[in-house]
């Protein structure tokens, strides 16, 4: 038990001590399925271009599409970025000021981020990031 707990703890802390540690549980849940869903979505990315523009223009106002684009942005960013600073810092800071204001996606991104991790990840991830 102890040996397992330590490796697990180190495993989570290895990626990131605090940022990823707490973020992994909340984000891990949506990330797992999200990444899988995004995998196909990313692959379809080439075919989605037509849908992306449409979804962005008309969907951002809608609910389902809004969560899809934002989800794709934060999750994929988090994966490739490895939670460097784009996801943590980008979500709170850029999402609110530079990115959130000028961009429509950031706006929905904040919504999706709040809605997705909402209870478990929302406050936790925000508090940790902040």
From Swiss-Prot:
tRNA processing is among the record's keywords: no
One Gene Ontology molecular-function label: transcription coactivator activity
Keyword Nucleus applies: yes
Record field: compositional bias (Polar residues): 1-16
Protein origin, superkingdom: Eukaryota
InterPro entries: Bcl-9/Bcl-9l (IPR015668)
Stretches with biased composition (Gly residues): 80-98
Subunit comment: Binds to beta-catenin (CTNNB1), PYGO1 and PYGO2; the interaction with PYGO1 increases PYGO1 affinity to histone H3 methylated at 'Lys 4'.
Record-given protein name: B-cell CLL/lymphoma 9 protein
Protein's organism: Sus scrofa (Pig)
Taxon lineage: Eukaryota, Metazoa, Chordata, Craniata, Vertebrata
Gene that specifies this protein: BCL9
């Amino acid at each position: 038990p102890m040996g397992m707990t330590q490796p697990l703890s180190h495993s989570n802390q290895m990626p990131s001590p605090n940022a990823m540690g707490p973020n992994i549980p909340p984000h891990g849940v949506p990330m797992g399925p999200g990444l899988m869903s995004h995998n196909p979505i990313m692959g379809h990315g080439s075919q989605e271009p037509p849908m992306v523009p449409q979804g962005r223009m008309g969907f951002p106002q809608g609910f389902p599409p809004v969560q899809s684009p934002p989800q794709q942005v934060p999750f994929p960013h988090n994966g490739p970025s490895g939670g460097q600073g784009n996801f943590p810092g980008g979500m709170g800071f850029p999402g609110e000021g530079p990115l959130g204001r000028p961009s429509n996606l950031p706006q929905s991104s904040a919504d999706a981020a709040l809605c997705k991790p909402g209870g478990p990840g929302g406050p936790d991830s925000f508090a940790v990031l902040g």
